[in-house]
Amino acid sequence: MKLLKLPSKLHDGQLTQCEVDDNKLYIIGGKYLSIWDSQTLLNAATGKTDVKEVKELEKMSLDLLESNQEDGRWLVVLDNQRLVYGSDHLLACLDLNKDSNSEYKSREIGIFKDNEAITDLKYDKVNGLLFVSLSKANSLQIMDSKTWELKSSIELKSKPISIITDPLGQLLTVILQNRSVQIYQYDSHGTTKLHQSINQFVQTNPLPYRMTMSPQGDVIPMINSLHNNVPTAVLLDRIQKFKIKLSLVGYVADCKILKFSPRIYSKTKSPTSNDTQTFNLLASSGNEDGNVVVWNTNRIKPLFDASKVVNSYITDLEWDNSGLGLFAISQDGQLVIFAFQENELGDVMPVEAVTEAAKEIKLLDPLPFKPKAEEPDTKLPPNKTAQQTTTNSKKQPKAAEITTISSTNMEFIQPSYMVPKDLKRKPVTEDPLLAQNKPANKKAKKELDQIDFLDTNLFLPSVSFSKVRLAHPKIRASFQYSSQGNFVLDIKNGLGNDQKPTSITLTRKDNESSKQLFQTFLPKFVTLCSAGSSFWAWSTDTGMIYVTSISGQMLFPPMLLGVPVSFLEGSGDYLLCITSIGQMYCWNVNTGKIAFPINDVYSLLNPMLRYSDDVLSRAENITMCAVTSQGIPIVTLSNGDGYMFDSAMEAWMLINDSWWPYGSQYWNFMSSAGVDLTSNDDEKKDKYWNAEADILAKEVKNNKNSIINYLETKTNDELTRKGRMKHLQRFAKVLLMKEGFENLEEMITLAHLENKILVSFRLKEVEEAIRLLKIYCIRIAEMGYTDRFSQTLSWLYDPTNTKFSPLDIDRRRNLIKDIIISCANIRQVQRVTTSYANELGVISDSL
C-alpha cells in the first residue's frame, strides 16, 4: 500500500464531500468544485507519475453559492455529465457539457427557508430519483432527476440525519434523530411504503453519517453499536430481515463514515485448496481522530488501520472504481490517496461478479401504482405517528434493539413499550383524523408516564459504573515471551475460531539445541502472557486467563474476568492481573487462592483532579506494572511516581515521589538511562557529610537487585523525558534562598530516607533496609534531631514494637550497637547513645 498526501491545500482549506464517477474524482468544498483524474492520482501515489505533474482537470467557482453566501456541502453525480450540488439552503444542478469557449452554468433547483436545512442528499441511478432530507419539516422529498418534478414526500417522526440508497433501487434507509432507523420500499414513480422500522439503533448526532450499502445490495451498515462493551459497527443482513450479520469489533466510537468498495474481492482459503471465499471491503473514519480503517466483511478485526492521516478530521471517503484506490478529504483541505497493490486486499473480481451476486437477492413485490387523482388531498400534520404514504396492513416484526453509544458514557438497552393484544388499555390516539371513526362518548383514561428500566440482560455493574478505562493490547499475529533465560513461549494467533485456532508452544532453548515442552491450541485470540517460577499464564481478548505448569498441565480451570486484560505479570508463585476497567487480582498459584481481596488502581490516577459527573477524562498513564516474588504489586505512572500495594493495610503506598529528586541528597543512587544525574564527590560533601554513611550509600547504589533503585531510575527517566529535571533543579536552588525555606533540603532528604526504610521493610528487602536505617540514624544525629534519634533506637530496642518486625531480637541489638558506634563521636546525641550503650554493655565490653 502506498499513501500520498497532496502538499497543497485545496479550496482554500475546506473540503466537505467527494464522489467518484467514470474514473473522475469530484470534490466540493467552500465555493469551489474541482475535478481530478482518479487514475492519475493513483499513479502518483505508486510513483508512476511525478507528484508535481498532478493537477486537477477542472476547477470552477460556483456562482450560486457565492451569490447566496453559502458553502457547498452536498454533491451527487448524475448521468449524462450532470451533477447536483447543494448547501444548507440551496440545491442546484451543474451541466458539465459545454463548448470550449463557454462557461459552466448552474441551474437553481430549489431554495429553502433559513430555518429549513438540507441534512442529506442522495441519488438512485436505477430509477433516476433524487432524495433530499429536510430538517424543519422532518420530511424526505423524492424528485425526478430529469424534470426536477417532486414525485412524493415522506413525513417522518423526527429529524432525518442520513440517507442510505439501495443499489438495486428498491429500499431507502433513513436514520432519524430519535435514534430509530426507517426502511422504506419505493419505485420509479415515487410511491413509497414503510418496509421495516428499527428503534434505538444509532446514536443521536447532528452531523450526518456518510454510509453506503454493499455493491450487491445485501448488507446495510450501521455505525456506533455496542459489542461486548466495545464500540462497533454492525452489518445488517437484508436477506435475514436485517438481523446482524457481522459486528466490526474494536471500532472507533466517533465514526461518521462507512463506505463499501464498489467491487467484490476473493481469496483462496488455503494454498493446497482451490476453494475461494468472496468478501467486501469497507472504509471507515472517525470524526476527530483522522484515522482511516479498512475492514474485510469476513473478519471482525480491522484489515488495515492508518492512524493520524491528517491533523484535522476526515470529512469524506470514496473508493476508486478499480477497487484498488481510496480517496480521503479532510476539513483543512487535504487530499489523501491510498493506492493498494494487486492481491494486497485480495483478488479483485470483475464487475460482472457484482451483477451476479445481486441476482441472488430476491426482490420485493412491486408497489401498486396510484395515480395522482386517486391520492388523498388532505395532508397529515407533520411529526405525527401516521404515515402519509401507503403502509403495510400486516403487523411488522419487532426489530432487534441494539445498545449504542451516544457519548463517552455508558447507555442501557431501553425497554419495549409495544402494547400486547390482551391489554385493554390502548394508547391515546394523537391524530384526530385517525380517531374520527371511533366512539367519543367514552372518557379517555389518563396516560401514564413511561418508566425507564435497566435491562438486566448482559449487565455488568463494574463496567457500567466504572470511571476507569485502561488500554489493552491489540491482537498481534505472533509474539514470544522469554522467562528464566532459556524458556520461550511462542504465541501464534489464528482467526479466533475453531477453524483456525491459536497455537501456544513452550520451548526450552539451550546453546545448541531446543526442546518443545508442550503445545496447545485455543479457538480465541491471545493478547498477553507471563510466567512465574513454576507456572505459565496467558489471557485472551475476552478476558479469560489460562494457567498451566511448565509441562503444560492446567493448574486451574480457565478464569473468566469479563473484560479485556491490560496487564498480566508473574513472579515466583504469584500472578498479577489488571483489567481494562482497573480491577486488580493477585493470585498465589501455589496455594490456589487469591493473595488479597480484589482491589483497583482507581486511586492512583488522581480521580479528584479530573472528576466530572458524566465525562471521562484523561489521567496519568501506567508505565509499568509488576509483582514481586513476595506477591506485592508495584505500579509506576507517567508522572514519575511509583506505588506498591500493601495487603495488610489494603491500600496503595507511595514508594517514590517525583518531588524528592529536587531536594533529597540521597536520591541519585542510580542515574537515569542515558543521563547521569549525579554530581561529583566534592559536591556531595556538605556539612553533614559522613564517611561511613557515604560507604553505606555506595553499597545501596551498587545493589542491582534493589526494587527501589529501579523505580527511582524510572522516575528519573520520566522527569528527563518531560524536560522537567534540569528546570526543577534550578527552581529548588532558587527556593532555598527564600525566607522560610532554609531547611527545605533537609526535610526532603529525611522524608525520602524515612520512606525508603519503611518501603524496604514492606518489600521484605531487609539487608537494604538495615543499611538505610544506619544512614538515617547518622544523618539525624548530625542534624541534631535528638528526639527522632531516640525514638528510632527505642523502636529497635522494644521487642514488642512491630515497626521493624522482620528483625529478630539479636539483629535489633546488633543494629543498635552499630548505630551507637557510628554516632559515638557526634556530640548532640552522646547522652542518648551513652544510655543505650550502658544498657547493652557496649561500654563495658569495649573497656
Swiss-Prot record:
Note the PROSITE patterns from the entry: WD_REPEATS_1
An annotated GO BP: regulation of DNA-templated transcription
- Please provide, alphabetically and separated by semicolons, the GO molecular function terms listed in this UniProt record: nucleosome binding
* Entry keywords, A to Z: Chromatin regulator, Nucleus, Repeat, Repressor, Transcription, Transcription regulation, WD repeat
Q: Where are the WD repeats?
A: 10-46, 113-153, 155-194, 259-305, 309-348, 508-548, 558-597
Renumbered to this chain, the Polar residues biased-composition regions fall at 384-394
| Pfam families on file | Hira
List the record's Gene Ontology CC terms alphabetically.
Answer: chromatin; HIR complex; nucleus
Q: Which InterPro entries match?
A: HIR1-like, HIRA-like_C, WD40/YVTN_repeat-like_dom_sf, WD40_repeat_dom_sf
Q: Where in the cell is it found?
A: Nucleus
Q: What is its main location?
A: nucleus
Q: Where is this region: Disordered?
A: 368-399
Biological role stated in the UniProt entry: Required for replication-independent chromatin assembly and for the periodic repression of histone gene transcription during the cell cycle.
What family does this belong to? Belongs to the WD repeat HIR1 family.
- The protein in question is named Protein HIR2
Q: Which organism is it from?
A: Kluyveromyces lactis (strain ATCC 8585 / CBS 2359 / DSM 70799 / NBRC 1267 / NRRL Y-1140 / WM37) (Yeast)
Question: Which gene does this sequence derive from?
Answer: HIR2
